[in-house]
């Protein structure tokens, strides 16, 4: 079975893929290309995921998977959306992004939100395929938990009565937006092997 190449340098994302593809070698693109970076100019998660997977597939001449994901807060008209990673500005980190979001929600009652993940799979001379996963939750007023990354410490999942940062990687793989999208991808790849 071929390696699963992920067009990301984000170890958190790579770990999410490894948690589901336990019997395959999952590698980040930095192991194959030094300083791979694609400007995310798309207006949607799908456009950004495709930009990354298509550029990486072209550069490596092999199948590559990429994702774009983020947080959509309903009371903020979908913000931070595609700007989730740079919500507080370029050069800022997860803590800065969380702080900006909590400030923007300071007097807001409706704190419903969803994480969205679109995975794209591209290969030379093939049409890019996409897989979308979501998970619904509520933005807390303070951080809880140490597991995960990004907005996980303030994203509360009512069904689990925990934030995403309080659940195990295995639990996260089963319910998270990325976990849902990765499972759809895995199902597709397993079906591909039986053709």
Curated annotation (Swiss-Prot):
GO MF assignments: dITP diphosphatase activity; ITP diphosphatase activity; metal ion binding; nucleotide binding; ribonucleoside triphosphate phosphatase activity; XTP diphosphatase activity
PANTHER family the record matches: INOSINE TRIPHOSPHATE PYROPHOSPHATASE, INOSINE TRIPHOSPHATE PYROPHOSPHATASE/HAM1 PROTEIN
Reaction it catalyzes: XTP + H2O = XMP + diphosphate + H(+); dITP + H2O = dIMP + diphosphate + H(+); ITP + H2O = IMP + diphosphate + H(+)
Signal peptide: none
Annotated protein name in UniProt: dITP/XTP pyrophosphatase
Keywords, in A-Z order: Hydrolase, Magnesium, Metal-binding, Nucleotide metabolism, Nucleotide-binding
Protein family membership: Belongs to the HAM1 NTPase family.
Organism whose genome encodes this protein: Staphylococcus epidermidis (strain ATCC 35984 / DSM 28319 / BCRC 17069 / CCUG 31568 / BM 3577 / RP62A)
Protein task: Pyrophosphatase that catalyzes the hydrolysis of nucleoside triphosphates to their monophosphate derivatives, with a high preference for the non-canonical purine nucleotides XTP (xanthosine triphosphate), dITP (deoxyinosine triphosphate) and ITP. Seems to function as a house-cleaning enzyme that removes non-canonical purine nucleotides from the nucleotide pool, thus preventing their incorporation into DNA/RNA and avoiding chromosomal lesions.
Binding positions (Mg(2+)): 39, 68
One GO CC term on file: cytosol
An annotated GO BP: purine nucleoside triphosphate catabolic process
Cofactor note: Binds 1 Mg(2+) ion per subunit.
Record's subunit section: Homodimer.
Cofactor: Mg(2+)
InterPro entries noted in UniProt: dITP/XTP_pyrophosphatase, ITPase-like_fam, RdgB/HAM1
Chain segments annotated as transmembrane: none
Active site residues per record: 68 (proton acceptor)
EC number: 3.6.1.66
Top-level taxon in the UniProt lineage: Bacteria
Residues that bind substrate: 8-13, 69, 149-152, 172, 177-178
